[in-house]
């Protein structure tokens, strides 16, 4: 089997079994929230020094389920890309930076994902290496991630559309989990959702309404300076969110 490699900085990792992990953390108390906010800068070096990680991102979130321009000082997340699910799980359990996040937070949830498809760029690269199509069942639980750098002149127009889209997602009984995240408030945005199968995900994407209209406006108005759309097979999850097992 041909082994593909992905390079970032000085790191070169096998990605034949690439795993993407999104770790969510909820904080309570002013000092814990201040610590979490500070880690948006300070945790970068710690994550960069973990040689098994080929790509990472730190996120804040919006109020509610994250799909608002108003920051939620309680919820933060880390996205990390690994070359093996066992290495990822062991590292997240044992590495100091993850231990500190767990110690400071009141709850945390980690979802392990295998890329199925990925189109576009994130900081001028595509960090996700998809599985072969035959390795994915249409009936398996899937996740969708979209990220975009919003052009400054479009920011107000973009955020005026978000409440209607958020309401549609929230009312969809098929969505198992959804969260809006941000690298840089208002400008670098990420949406993440989990669906029971490919059909449910596709039905939402094709449905007429605010979501479809927003996509049309994005394409016609060239709203984003950079964007990426990815789908994943959900492999497993560890921890709880809102006091319960999500999937």
For the regions a protein language model found, what residue spans apply to each?
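Short S/T/G/P-rich N-terminal loop/turn motif that feeds into the first structured element of a domain
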Residues: 1-76, 85-91, 104-190, 200-209, ...
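C-terminal end-helix/capping segment
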Residues: 215-221
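Short beta-strand-to-loop acidic/aromatic patch adjacent to the donor-nucleotide binding site
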Residues: 79
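An exposed tryptophan-centered "aromatic clamp" motif
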Residues: 224
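A common structural junction motif
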Residues: 96-103, 212-213
